[in-house]
Swiss-Prot record:
<dbReference type="GO" id="GO:0005840">
    <property type="term" value="C:ribosome"/>
</dbReference>
<dbReference type="InterPro" id="IPR000589">
    <property type="entry name" value="Ribosomal_uS15"/>
</dbReference>
<dbReference type="InterPro" id="IPR009068">
    <property type="entry name" value="uS15_NS1_RNA-bd_sf"/>
</dbReference>
<dbReference type="InterPro" id="IPR005290">
    <property type="entry name" value="Ribosomal_uS15_bac-type"/>
</dbReference>
<dbReference type="Pfam" id="PF00312">
    <property type="entry name" value="Ribosomal_S15"/>
</dbReference>
<comment type="similarity">
    <text>Belongs to the universal ribosomal protein uS15 family.</text>
</comment>
<keyword id="KW-0934">Plastid</keyword>
<protein>
    <recommendedName>
        <fullName>Small ribosomal subunit protein uS15c</fullName>
    </recommendedName>
</protein>
<dbReference type="GO" id="GO:0009507">
    <property type="term" value="C:chloroplast"/>
</dbReference>
<keyword id="KW-0150">Chloroplast</keyword>
<dbReference type="GO" id="GO:1990904">
    <property type="term" value="C:ribonucleoprotein complex"/>
</dbReference>
<dbReference type="GO" id="GO:0003735">
    <property type="term" value="F:structural constituent of ribosome"/>
</dbReference>
<dbReference type="GO" id="GO:0006412">
    <property type="term" value="P:translation"/>
</dbReference>
<comment type="subunit">
    <text>Part of the 30S ribosomal subunit.</text>
</comment>
<keyword id="KW-0687">Ribonucleoprotein</keyword>
<keyword id="KW-0689">Ribosomal protein</keyword>
Length: 90
């Protein structure tokens, strides 16, 4: 434990674990899914926002490619992720 400015800051290892998780395929798919859901709800209100629609399509493509990669490399992790996020299988 380190002290900085009167506050206790817990470990160096916590930051490392967070950084490791950010790079994983599962975290990236999770992040893209959250962005996709947010953009989809935005587009329901703003039907003529074509730049956001294009951004949504790009995110869908990125997520699809990551899911295809994960399905090819590790089918068990792919199935688990699909069920957790409630998204359809390709």
């Amino acid at each position: 434990m380190k002290k900085k400015g009167g506050r206790k800051i817990f470990g160096f290892m916590v930051k490392e674990e967070k950084e490791e998780k950010k790079g994983s395929v599962e975290f990236q798919v999770f992040s893209f899914t959250n962005k996709i859901r947010r953009l989809a709800s935005h587009l329901e209100l703003h039907k003529k926002d074509f730049s956001s629609e294009r951004g949504l399509r790009r995110l869908l493509g990125k997520r699809r490619r990551l899911l295809a990669y994960l399905a090819k490399k590790n089918r068990v992790r792919y199935k688990k992720l699909i069920s957790q996020l409630n998204i359809r299988e390709q």
